[in-house]
Amino acid sequence: MILDEPLKLTQAKSLIREILKSGEVIYSKPHAEERLRKWNLTTVDCVNVLRGGAVAEGEYENGSWRYKVYTPRICVVVRFESDNMLQIVTAWRET
């Protein structure tokens, strides 16, 4: 677990990119998987949002810090499991 959360926006974005490059991305089961189906999103859509989206301030919810990463069309919520693993908690299409 990352001990110095909440991360600054630049730190969160850098860590997300580093994890995408050399870490592991996991999906909350069953919630994230259900949301991807509901909103007709793919894992590639989520990775693309994580690569190029903006990061919002962290929010503390259900015992962990969560970060919204968003584009005008899609929002993905992540939490950091460790310095080299993030979990996609949920995702949706902006309407």
Q: Which residue stretches match the model-derived regions?
A:
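Ribonuclease/tRNase effector modules and their secretory precursors
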Residues: 1-95
